[in-house]
Protein backbone atom coordinates (compact mmCIF):
# COMPACT_ATOMS: atom_id res chain seq x y z
CA UNK A 1 0.00 0.00 0.00
CA UNK A 2 2.86 2.40 0.75
CA UNK A 3 4.34 1.84 -2.76
CA UNK A 4 0.98 2.68 -4.31
CA UNK A 5 0.72 5.84 -2.21
CA UNK A 6 4.30 6.75 -3.15
CA UNK A 7 3.59 6.42 -6.92
CA UNK A 8 0.39 8.45 -6.67
CA UNK A 9 2.29 11.18 -4.83
CA UNK A 10 4.99 11.27 -7.54
CA UNK A 11 2.39 11.44 -10.30
CA UNK A 12 0.48 14.26 -8.60
CA UNK A 13 3.70 16.16 -7.90
CA UNK A 14 4.80 15.80 -11.55
CA UNK A 15 1.40 16.98 -12.82
CA UNK A 16 1.52 20.02 -10.54
CA UNK A 17 4.97 20.99 -11.79
CA UNK A 18 4.07 20.50 -15.46
CA UNK A 19 0.90 22.56 -15.24
CA UNK A 20 2.62 25.30 -13.23
CA UNK A 21 5.31 25.63 -15.88
CA UNK A 22 2.87 26.04 -18.75
CA UNK A 23 3.91 29.01 -20.82
CA UNK A 24 1.18 31.54 -21.51
CA UNK A 25 0.88 33.33 -24.80
CA UNK A 26 2.71 36.56 -24.20
CA UNK A 27 2.17 39.60 -26.34
CA UNK A 28 -1.26 38.53 -27.55
CA UNK A 29 -4.13 40.73 -26.53
CA UNK A 30 -7.54 39.15 -26.99
CA UNK A 31 -9.66 41.01 -29.53
CA UNK A 32 -13.35 41.39 -28.83
CA UNK A 33 -16.01 40.40 -31.35
CA UNK A 34 -18.80 42.04 -29.35
CA UNK A 35 -21.12 44.47 -31.15
CA UNK A 36 -23.40 45.00 -28.16
CA UNK A 37 -24.50 48.45 -27.03
CA UNK A 38 -24.52 48.08 -23.26
CA UNK A 39 -25.89 51.50 -22.26
CA UNK A 40 -27.72 54.44 -23.82
CA UNK A 41 -28.69 57.60 -21.94
CA UNK A 42 -29.63 61.19 -22.58
CA UNK A 43 -27.44 63.92 -21.12
CA UNK A 44 -28.97 66.25 -18.55
CA UNK A 45 -30.34 69.48 -20.01
CA UNK A 46 -32.45 71.63 -17.70
CA UNK A 47 -33.25 74.10 -20.49
CA UNK A 48 -35.27 71.43 -22.31
CA UNK A 49 -36.85 69.30 -19.54
CA UNK A 50 -35.80 68.16 -16.07
CA UNK A 51 -34.30 64.73 -15.32
CA UNK A 52 -33.42 63.83 -18.90
CA UNK A 53 -30.49 61.80 -17.63
CA UNK A 54 -32.93 59.57 -15.69
CA UNK A 55 -35.01 58.54 -18.73
CA UNK A 56 -34.80 54.76 -19.12
CA UNK A 57 -34.01 53.35 -22.58
CA UNK A 58 -34.60 49.79 -23.71
CA UNK A 59 -31.92 48.16 -25.85
CA UNK A 60 -33.35 45.21 -27.77
CA UNK A 61 -30.28 43.28 -28.91
CA UNK A 62 -32.19 40.78 -31.06
CA UNK A 63 -34.24 43.29 -33.05
CA UNK A 64 -31.60 46.03 -32.95
CA UNK A 65 -33.86 48.67 -31.38
CA UNK A 66 -33.10 51.42 -28.87
CA UNK A 67 -36.15 53.28 -27.56
CA UNK A 68 -37.74 54.83 -24.49
CA UNK A 69 -40.91 52.98 -23.45
CA UNK A 70 -42.15 55.92 -21.38
CA UNK A 71 -42.59 58.80 -23.81
CA UNK A 72 -41.06 62.19 -23.14
CA UNK A 73 -43.51 65.05 -22.42
CA UNK A 74 -45.37 66.68 -25.30
CA UNK A 75 -43.41 69.53 -26.82
CA UNK A 76 -39.98 68.12 -26.00
CA UNK A 77 -37.57 69.34 -28.66
CA UNK A 78 -35.70 66.16 -29.54
CA UNK A 79 -33.43 67.97 -31.98
CA UNK A 80 -31.56 69.53 -29.06
CA UNK A 81 -30.98 66.35 -27.04
CA UNK A 82 -27.48 65.00 -26.48
CA UNK A 83 -26.73 61.40 -25.57
CA UNK A 84 -24.05 58.96 -24.49
CA UNK A 85 -23.71 55.31 -25.39
CA UNK A 86 -21.38 52.56 -24.26
CA UNK A 87 -20.11 49.50 -26.09
CA UNK A 88 -17.61 46.76 -25.38
CA UNK A 89 -14.47 47.88 -27.22
CA UNK A 90 -16.09 48.73 -30.54
CA UNK A 91 -13.70 49.93 -33.23
CA UNK A 92 -16.33 52.11 -34.92
CA UNK A 93 -19.74 53.53 -34.05
CA UNK A 94 -21.31 55.11 -37.12
CA UNK A 95 -24.50 57.12 -36.70
CA UNK A 96 -26.50 57.74 -39.85
CA UNK A 97 -29.28 60.32 -40.05
CA UNK A 98 -31.29 61.21 -43.15
CA UNK A 99 -28.31 62.19 -45.30
CA UNK A 100 -25.13 62.15 -43.19
CA UNK A 101 -22.98 59.58 -41.38
CA UNK A 102 -20.96 60.48 -38.27
CA UNK A 103 -18.34 58.47 -36.39
CA UNK A 104 -19.37 58.70 -32.73
CA UNK A 105 -15.91 57.73 -31.43
CA UNK A 106 -14.08 60.40 -33.44
CA UNK A 107 -16.60 63.25 -33.39
CA UNK A 108 -17.47 64.79 -30.03
CA UNK A 109 -19.69 67.47 -31.54
CA UNK A 110 -22.46 65.56 -33.24
CA UNK A 111 -25.10 67.74 -34.90
CA UNK A 112 -28.17 68.80 -32.94
CA UNK A 113 -30.66 67.36 -35.43
CA UNK A 114 -29.56 63.79 -34.77
CA UNK A 115 -32.84 62.45 -33.47
CA UNK A 116 -34.74 61.91 -36.64
CA UNK A 117 -34.94 58.14 -36.57
CA UNK A 118 -31.22 57.38 -36.64
CA UNK A 119 -29.34 54.20 -37.45
CA UNK A 120 -26.38 53.22 -35.29
CA UNK A 121 -23.86 50.77 -36.74
CA UNK A 122 -21.44 49.15 -34.28
CA UNK A 123 -18.30 47.46 -35.67
CA UNK A 124 -16.49 44.95 -33.44
CA UNK A 125 -12.93 45.53 -32.31
CA UNK A 126 -11.72 42.80 -34.65
CA UNK A 127 -13.69 44.33 -37.54
CA UNK A 128 -15.29 40.95 -38.27
CA UNK A 129 -18.81 41.75 -37.09
CA UNK A 130 -21.28 44.60 -37.56
CA UNK A 131 -24.66 45.26 -35.94
CA UNK A 132 -27.22 47.90 -36.86
CA UNK A 133 -29.49 49.50 -34.28
CA UNK A 134 -32.51 51.74 -34.93
CA UNK A 135 -32.77 54.65 -32.47
CA UNK A 136 -36.27 56.00 -31.78
CA UNK A 137 -37.11 58.59 -29.14
CA UNK A 138 -40.80 58.57 -28.26
CA UNK A 139 -42.56 61.85 -27.40
CA UNK A 140 -46.23 62.26 -26.40
CA UNK A 141 -48.36 63.54 -29.29
CA UNK A 142 -51.20 64.68 -27.02
CA UNK A 143 -51.21 66.53 -23.73
CA UNK A 144 -51.97 63.85 -21.09
CA UNK A 145 -53.64 66.43 -18.81
CA UNK A 146 -56.42 67.26 -21.31
CA UNK A 147 -59.38 65.28 -22.61
CA UNK A 148 -59.94 65.10 -26.35
CA UNK A 149 -63.45 64.42 -27.62
CA UNK A 150 -62.84 65.15 -31.31
CA UNK A 151 -64.06 62.56 -33.78
CA UNK A 152 -66.71 61.10 -31.46
CA UNK A 153 -70.14 60.83 -33.06
CA UNK A 154 -73.42 60.43 -31.16
Per-segment meaning from a language model:
Residues 1-9:
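Bacterial N-terminal signal peptides that target proteins for export
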Residues 17-20:
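C-terminal motif of bacterial Sec signal peptides marking the signal peptidase cleavage site
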Residues 22-154:
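Predominantly extracytoplasmic/ectodomain segments of secreted and cell-surface proteins
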